[in-house]
Swiss-Prot record:
It comes from Schizosaccharomyces pombe (strain 972 / ATCC 24843) (Fission yeast). Belongs to the HyuE racemase family. Keywords: Cytoplasm. One of its GO terms (cellular component) is cytoplasm. This is Uncharacterized protein C576.02. It is found in: Cytoplasm.
């Protein structure tokens, strides 16, 4: 029975709760989930390189032996570039995956041209760089669409207004940009995955990166695979 630690690298417990409520009914019964939220004084949301770096340090310090006891793999639920994934891979043998990588790996397996729905234009720019670092050709990326609002601003919008905005952006990715698979850029966006699926139709897969990461990591754990300790991830 693989045990996956799902890390919310910001300090907003409502996001952790939302992830837990969404994930638990979806994962197989033989997969156990644990959750960790960034300790205070971590940022409430991550919308910048600085916030990603500072929260990574706080979360890393919280990964004590007691927290990691019995854990088989770690998912980092941040849809922005964060040093936390590489920090964990370098310091532990446990498989670790960020939700950007998980969603893109899944998308490349079921579609030809990826669309990503994200929060701000800054996130859009950072994601293009991150995809380049994964070796994903720009020809496989239909577009990255931003809402023009931070994660915190999105969370504070009336639910119907937020849903309308996100659905509209997803439809643009599919109908205007030619995306044949869409990744939801953040744990907060996954709450309306079903509504987006209805809006774009059944032929276009909608990928929740957190769910994708848990499923991929459970598979790695079942294969008894660990992070390579030869090369870049040699122990410090």
């Amino acid at each position: 029975m693989p045990t996956i630690l799902v890390i919310n690298p910001n300090s907003s417990t409502f996001i952790t709760t939302s992830m837990e409520e969404k994930l638990v009914p979806l994962v197989p019964s033989d997969v156990k989930l644990r959750f960790l939220t960034c300790p205070q004084p971590g940022a409430a949301v991550i919308d910048s390189i600085t916030e990603a770096t500072l929260t990574a340090a706080l979360v890393f310090q919280a990964l004590t032996p007691s927290v990691l006891d019995g854990v088989d793999a770690i998912a980092v639920a941040c849809y922005s570039p964060t040093p936390l994934v590489d920090m964990i891979r370098e310091s532990f043998a446990l498989p670790c995956m960020g939700i950007v990588q998980a969603s893109v790996l899944s998308a490349l397996s079921v579609g030809q041209r990826i669309g990503i729905l994200t929060s701000t234009y800054r996130s859009e720019c950072l994601l293009y760089e991150l995809l380049d670092s994964f070796g994903v050709s720009r020809t496989r990326v239909a577009a990255i669409a931003s809402t023009g609002r931070t994660v915190l601003q999105l969370s504070q919008m009336p639910s119907q207004e937020r849903e309308t905005l996100l659905v509209q952006k997803a439809q643009e990715l599919a109908n205007t940009k030619g995306a044949d698979v869409i990744c939801l850029g953040g744990a907060a966006l996954a709450a309306i995955r079903d509504q987006i699926q209805v809006a774009v139709g059944p032929n276009i897969p909608i990928i929740d990166g957190v769910h994708a990461a848990v499923e991929l990591l459970a598979g790695l754990a079942r294969q008894n695979l660990h992070t390579s300790k030869f090369g870049i991830y040699t122990y410090p």
